């Protein structure tokens, strides 16, 4: 009996000890989870161009995020953020931390950072925000303020109203560009058009007219100013040639004339017809064999009211102004567009919150591929007379080939996972170029 009693007491004591251990263990787990839940997710901007102190705490939905440019916080950061135009080839956070992702924001064409549009570079990123519909935070229609901007008649001028300006040719074509010498050979093509057609050219490229004095001061930073839109809306056609011909790379050059009720003469994104408001909203340079053939069609269109207005159904069809379901769906679901002044609506804030959400809810092994920023290695340009090529196409081809080699060098350094500087990067790049060791294989 005494033995049984002692055994029972020992058992009770053992159970109490076990319960105590279990209690403190569970408390530790709960406290750990609370710390993990309550601590903000940290993200670090990796850009020496951000010379100012940036350290903010932002509420991204249900998640609290801390975003900073203090590099000393990298060991605790869940993500490192890069802005494409500011990336320096000798400045990357290596060795990488296993718990971190790399995130890339780049809405521009590859002219400034040609290495970005290569699979060898892209595959080291877990999150992207680019013009491509396939990126994690697509910016394909970012330059279209709203669907209402397309259908509104705020700047609309009737066909007869456009035709009353007797001092202009009936074709009434405008060209407004100050970014010259582009990968797409924009000025070369416009020069060809000018041989067959009078074109009013404003801006720094091929200028033959001056903007009104009130618009000359800072029009590049006011591309959608009401005064500028009213001035341009008097024209029938506007030349809209992108800097580069990348899938889904669509800028204000396409949307602005549509907003004004002016027909765009477009060259650029090969996927542009996926995004036009209706099946016939723009004139596409690629549909014509050469500039002269395009001019012949413009002359026909400019004198035919019914045919001209058939391109402006987004303004004239009240029942169904926009028939493109893909575009309509994008306008409802997209996360960013210009002109949104609400709190937290800037491009960088949207990107930061999207990355914050991503690191919490998505597996780290998901990585970017070539579709996330797909620009061709070989510069693409419009067909010109007599199979001419743009004046500087060879220079752009060489720049893109160097960019491809840069991507391969970066890929090698990233795989080694050891820090490197500009001098080491340049030495390896020069070694490859001098040894003809940069493959020109297909970028697929």
UniProtKB/Swiss-Prot annotation:
InterPro entries given in the database record: Alpha-1_3-FUT_met, Glyco_tran_10_C, Glyco_tran_10_N, Glyco_trans_10, GT10-like_C_sf
A GO molecular function held by the record: alpha-(1->3)-fucosyltransferase activity
Q: Where does it sit, as one GO cellular component term? A: Golgi membrane
Ranges in the topological domain labelled Lumenal: 28-444
Localisation: Golgi apparatus, Golgi stack membrane
Known EC number(s)?
2.4.1.-
Instruction: Please verify whether the record's keywords include Coiled coil.
Output: no
Claim: ATP-binding is one of the keywords in the record: no
Q: Which residues form a coiled coil?
A: none
Q: Which domain of life is it from?
A: Eukaryota
* Glycosylated sites: 279, 437, 440
- The residue ranges for the Cytoplasmic side of the membrane come to 1-6
UniProt keywords, alphabetically: Glycoprotein, Glycosyltransferase, Golgi apparatus, Membrane, Signal-anchor, Transferase, Transmembrane, Transmembrane helix
What's the protein's topology in the membrane?
A: Single-pass type II membrane protein
Q: In which pathway does it act?
A: Protein modification; protein glycosylation
Q: Which residues cross the membrane?
A: 7-27
A single GO BP term for this record reads: fucosylation
Its top-level enzyme class, in one word, is transferase
Q: Which Pfam families match?
A: Glyco_tran_10_N (PF17039), Glyco_transf_10 (PF00852)
Q: Which family does it belong to?
A: Belongs to the glycosyltransferase 10 family.
User: What protein does this entry describe?
Assistant: Alpha-(1,3)-fucosyltransferase B
